[in-house]
From Swiss-Prot:
One of its GO terms (molecular function) is long-chain-alcohol O-fatty-acyltransferase activity. PANTHER family: ACYL-COA WAX ALCOHOL ACYLTRANSFERASE 1, DIACYLGLYCEROL O-ACYLTRANSFERASE. GO terms for biological process: lipid metabolic process. Signal peptide: none annotated. Pfam families: DAGAT (PF03982). It comes from Mus musculus (Mouse). One of its GO terms (cellular component) is endoplasmic reticulum membrane. InterPro entries: DAGAT (IPR007130). Acyltransferase that catalyzes the formation of ester bonds between fatty alcohols and fatty acyl-CoAs to form wax monoesters. Shows a strong preference for decyl alcohol (C10), with less activity towards C16 and C18 alcohols. Shows a strong preference for saturated acyl-CoAs. The gene is Awat1. Its EC number is 2.3.1.75. This is Acyl-CoA wax alcohol acyltransferase 1.
Amino acid sequence: MSCSMKTEHLQSLSLLQWPLSYVAMFWIVQPLLICLLFTPLWPLPTVYFVWLLLDWKTPDKGGRRSDWVRNWNVWNHIRDYFPITILKTKDLSPSENYIMGVHPHGLLTFGAFCNFCTEATGFSKTFPGITPHLATLSWFFKIPIIRDYIMAKGLCSVSQASIDYLLSHGTGNLVGIVVGGVGEALQSVPNTTTLLLKKRKGFVRTALQHGAHLVPTFTFGETEVYDQVLFHEDSRMFKFQSLFRRIFGFYCCVFYGQGFHQDCKGLLPYHKPIITVVGEALPLPQVKNPSPEIVDKYHALYMDALYKLFEQHKVQYGCSNTQKLIFL
């Protein structure tokens, strides 16, 4: 086996461990903890569960990040698989707080994870003095073991309490919100740039309440790494996907990429570059109780800034000159 092939297989295995680690924690580690309660080792899980109760509100109070976890070498292999990079267009001042709109959601948000939940692309060196927090579904933090793992990588709850805490305790905090949410995952097909944004205004309201700056970002290539099977709204499969979302909070998407060999289908993503372009921060005044008109004003300014960011970089990063950013 050639050296390049070994490297490629190592990158593929590193990528697979990302979702499989959660599966192992949920289906192996958690049942093991429960089983240990009925053995002489019962004090170990008992101490953890007591500590879990005492630590329950930590995800809403800034989380508990670990620089050691964020610097694991495995994230570098995931970065190199695509590869994933981050592009800074303007500096971010550590004397301010920020809400960063992450677009698009994609299927597994590889770009946002690698850029903001690890140091694989050098976020801390690119934006010195800025602490990134990527917000995700709150119920993930109710799952033992998994909650601690994702907090270590810098993820936080997308709850209002969590975001309010981060934006009101010190400066230099950046909260990344995937504004399109799980609904945007169904828009994730190659050669499309469609965002669910027109009615998503809560992040603007929160930014105004705290006087936080808004930072538009666009990740080119995020929707190119998988093909997705889309179903008609009247089909049974679409109804199942909708039911699944109501129960679990996200869609059960049917998608495929490549296998360990690029000439076969599988669940590995395609080797395509993913580039997150971080735009210039949009300053907002602090308005404790912003009116709908003020929210609409800054929401429109944000959409305009995001559109210009896309137009400025689209050809350089794989989009055609005629491709447009569509807001739904």
